[in-house]
Amino acid sequence: MSASEPLLDAAFLDDFAHRWLQGWNAHDGEAVAALCTEGVEFSDPLLGTVRGRAAVAGWVRSCAQAFPDYRFEEPERPYLSRDAAKAIVPWRMIATNTGPIDPPGFAPTGRSIVVDGVDHWWFGDGLVEHYRADYDAQGLSVQLGLAPAPGSRTQHVLAAAQRLAAKLPRRRRG
């Protein structure tokens, strides 16, 4: 946020969060990207970081491809930081994975998911300048069948295999 920019307030944030949620739930990448600065940095714990409006629009399209029925809910109102430069926005995503997850290229699993998370928005000129999502990436991976459930037989087998592999002598490259 620039030094000359007025501080954000609750009314602005509520309206902004409503437009953000509308864009996502309409699967409209351009609408979401329009709420970001041209040089936005957009980060996700599983998918990494992209930069720029075009990349954000592509991100929304990729999400809609992987989860065509996705919808986001806002279980609580957004929170504004004390200095009014950052917002924390709780959300819940409900979806079914019927398309490829790209990146990284996972095939559809057909599994339904429910993921709770929060968005962190830093503003510049009244738009999102830096975005970071936080959610339980391990829990999402388990729901999708991409990782074993904690305490499951599969997890125990993988742990045993890892212990065996750790005992094997490592070849030196030279």
Task: Indicate residue ranges for each PLM-predicted region.
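C-terminal and inter-domain tail/linker signature
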Residues: M1-G174
